[in-house]
From Swiss-Prot:
The gene is oxyR. One of its GO terms (molecular function) is DNA binding. GO terms for cellular component: protein-DNA complex. Keywords: Activator, DNA-binding, Transcription, Transcription regulation. Required for the induction the katG gene for catalase. Involved in the response to hydrogen peroxide. This is Probable hydrogen peroxide-inducible genes activator. Residues 25-44 bind DNA. It holds the Pfam family LysR_substrate. InterPro entries: LysR_subst-bd, Tscrpt_reg_HTH_LysR, WH-like_DNA-bd_sf, WH_DNA-bd_sf.
Length: 311
């Protein structure tokens, strides 16, 4: 039976959150700077006080019980609040001085991440980024679970409990095989996609959905190529080999055009494109910090790429 007078300690909740996020005691103990035996004792005391088992222990991996999964978001919120309280009490004036877990979608990472990392290292030397690359849906799931602090994704992201800050817009460019009649054109109508074999990324990539949306808005039904690609770089190589055409974001052009004999064409106005933004948990209490980070990211990317900052 639970002790109705029991009040969980921050140490106990922090231990639970660490074990839940790492899914193992060794990694959680290392992250907290304690021994595994100490961590186990603290977590056991929390479970005893609550009168419920939070995790299932095994020799290789830790699993959350249904009760643990239900209580984890509350524990994460308390730990985040405690950390914010400690930072405020210490008189911190720079909310971006510590570590941050940042997620990015695959069609952003190879093209703008080097610019972002170099700029942050120069402008915010105290901020250490831990980067995770994944598709949008999985990034949002991990973000909601508390294993990420923020993510750079294509908007909109209509997800409960998540706040989005638009950063920049960029055009899509039509990637064509070398020598294609449309290569070099600057006013290709989107309706031209009806007559071209469109090569798409695999299911789950937001760029796939965006390409199909371009066709839909143009009122055409795309002729899909027989080939699909797991990455934009692979898609570009397939296009170079004559297997179809594809859409690439403007930020990808310098990289992809430099390593392949790629034909490129601009769409006629209004040019289709995408909006990239920063998302974070609405409950984090760090809106100002993330808005500052979003502004810095936009400034860095716009200095090196042909994008339009969202005002």
């Amino acid at each position: 039976m639970p002790d109705k007078t029991y009040q969980p300690t921050i140490a106990g909740l922090r231990a639970f959150v660490a074990v839940a996020e790492k899914r193992q005691f060794s990694g959680a103990a290392t992250a907290l700077g304690v021994s595994q035996s100490t961590l186990s004792q603290v977590l056991a005391a929390l479970e005893a006080g609550l009168g419920t088992q939070l995790v299932e222990r095994s020799t290789r991996r830790v699993f959350l019980t249904p009760q643990g999964a239900e209580l984890l978001p509350h524990a994460q919120a308390v730990v985040e609040a405690a950390d914010a309280f400690t930072a405020a009490a210490a008189g911190s004036t720079d909310p971006l001085r510590a570590g941050m877990r940042l997620g990015l979608i695959p069609t952003v990472v190879p093209y703008v991440l080097p610019t972002v990392l170099a700029g942050i290292a120069e402008r915010r030397p105290g901020l250490t980024l831990r980067v995770t690359e994944d598709q949008t849906e999985r990034l949002l799931a991990v973000l909601r679970e508390g294993a990420l602090d923020a993510a750079l994704i294509a908007l909109p992201a209509e997800t409960a409990g998540v706040t989005a800050i638009p950063i920049y817009d960029e055009d899509f460019v039509l990637a064509l095989p070398p020598g294609h009649p449309l290569a070099g054109k600057r006013r290709v109508p989107a309706t031209a996609l009806a007559d071209l074999p469109l090569l798409l990324l695999d299911e789950g990539h937001c760029l796939r959905d965006q390409a199909l949306d371009v066709c839909h808005k143009a009122g055409v039904r795309a002729e899909l190529a027989n080939t699909r690609a797991a990455s934009l770089a692979t898609a570009v190589q397939c296009v170079t080999g004559g297997l179809g055409v594809t859409l690439i974001p403007q930020s990808a052009v310098p990289v992809e055009a430099s390593r392949s004999r790629l034909g490129l064409a601009q769409f006629a106005a209004p040019r289709p494109g995408r909006r990239i933004g920063l998302v974070f948990r609405s409950s984090s209490g760090r809106d100002d910090s993330y808005r500052e980070l979003a502004g810095l990211i936009g400034e860095l990317i716009s200095s090196q790429h042909q994008v339009r900052l969202v005002k």
